[in-house]
Design a protein with these regions (language model features):
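N-terminal "domain-start" segment that seeds a small globular fold
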Residues: 19-46
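Short hydrophobic alpha-helix segments
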Residues: 47, 126, 145-147
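Conserved redox-active cysteine motifs that mediate thiol-disulfide chemistry
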Residues: 50, 58-75
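Alpha/beta-hydrolase fold active-site loops
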Residues: 53-54, 85, 132, 142
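Structural microenvironment flanking redox-active thiols in thiol-disulfide oxidoreductases
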Residues: 67-108, 118-125
Length: 175
């Protein structure tokens, strides 16, 4: 009985934070020039987006918190996309499930660019350990903030940070 209690207690501790985001100390340095293909087969690099603030979200079709936060990301793109924010929803599913990814994107009317990172090279370059993982990157390519887990708890912070990022990007373009 005691052993069962401890197992349940440990399981509760492990999974209690599974649906919340943890802000990390901003990573140092510039984003990688790693190239990848989009869901449509177009080759892109993060370097292609220099001059624009980015929200990069790593996700998978099997990840419940990832699916849960797409309405938030769609709303963010709707709000800040007109001001230059680019949303990249980087899928880390295995290439064998690409048809499932396409079905998911279609069913959820996701309009932003969906790069594919099936070997998790880009994900690992950002020290990713769990999904979803969201990064805010300034127009110069510097990682400003990293969120691990469901974004709902940090929506207000993200909106404030994105507002600053698009304002700073606009003022730099005007100079």
């Amino acid at each position: 009985m005691t052993k069962r209690f401890y197992l349940i207690a440990v399981a509760l501790l492990i999974f209690s934070g599974a649906d919340s985001a943890t802000p990390f100390i901003p990573l140092q340095g510039n984003v990688t020039s790693y190239r990848m293909k989009t869901l449509e087969g177009k080759k892109i690099s993060l370097r292609d987006y220099r001059g624009s603030p980015l929200l990069i979200n790593f996700w998978a079709t099997w990840c419940a918190p990832c699916r849960k936060e797409f309405p938030i990301i769609k709303e963010i793109e709707k709000k800040f996309g007109k001001d230059g924010l680019v949303v990249l929803a980087v899928n880390v599913d295995d290439t064998r499930t690409i048809s499932g990814v396409k079905s998911f994107v279609s069913a959820h009317s996701l309009k932003f660019t969906i790069p594919l990172d099936p070997n998790r090279k880009l994900f690992n370059s950002f020290h990713g350990t769990s999904l979803p993982l969201t990064l805010l990157i300034d127009a110069s390519g510097n990682v400003i903030r990293t969120y691990s887990g469901f974004l709902g708890a940090w929506e207000e912070d993200i909106n404030r940070e994105l507002s600053e990022l698009v304002t700073n990007a606009s003022s730099k373009k005007a100079e």
